[in-house]
């Protein structure tokens, strides 16, 4: 056998082996990780996918760390719970190789209170709860600045911390709480950053009753379907995302679950 033919056969064998592995990787059920805040519409999408011959398994997590670890390790194929700034920070902190695959929705977060009915009623020395992760905590601080309760250093932006506060005229005590627990903090604090979907699940307060909303014109905060880099060609994933984004049944569930406090991210 001449050398050229030997290498040609070797290359063909390698290609066949690679194709077999790729096919195996993209066979079986698509495993989707999420949290309680995004699960109900996904459950509807899973049911619709089954009708179309696509088997999808939904894995629900109770924190915001395990979903990324699970995608990185290959335990699940995709997760849905985070926006791009959170993902970028997670990649930097965890050494992950994760990328956004497609947009899902954006939620209208706000500042909530069970003790006061207007921002100007927040007392001097009052206690305010924001998220304790760097990115969503910054979002909370930006909301407080929008409410004119604090002023941040110019340019602090999406990575603001409490150290960036340059003016706090009401001497507010800002405490940092795990984001999924912010709704429960409302019994103890004067004001809290709130996520409508978690408020709805906890039944702590009407999600529509925020003293101030952030608004939906923030494309950076659109929640993303996130995968490990290199798996962009998974046909199961493309089909499932298409169902999530375009099925009338899923859209009806999104409307029912989030009400008017969300917007499809793929329309931005």
Regions found by a protein language model. Give the residues of each.
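Short, polar/charged alpha-helical segment
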Residues: 35-57
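A conserved helix-loop-strand patch within extracytoplasmic ligand-binding domains
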Residues: 101-151
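Beta->alpha turn/N-cap motifs
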Residues: 60-64, 79-87, 105, 178-179, ...
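Ligand-binding clefts/hinges and TM-proximal coupling segments of bilobed small-molecule sensing domains
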Residues: 135-159, 242-268
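Short helix-initiation/N-cap motifs at beta->coil->alpha
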Residues: 59-69, 156-184
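A bilobed periplasmic-binding-protein/Venus flytrap-type ligand-binding module shared by bacterial periplasmic
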Residues: 108-119, 221-236
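Ligand-binding "clamshell"
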Residues: 89-101, 114-116, 188, 193, ...
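Immediate post-signal peptide segment of exported/extracytoplasmic ligand-binding proteins
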Residues: 20-31, 49-51, 119-125
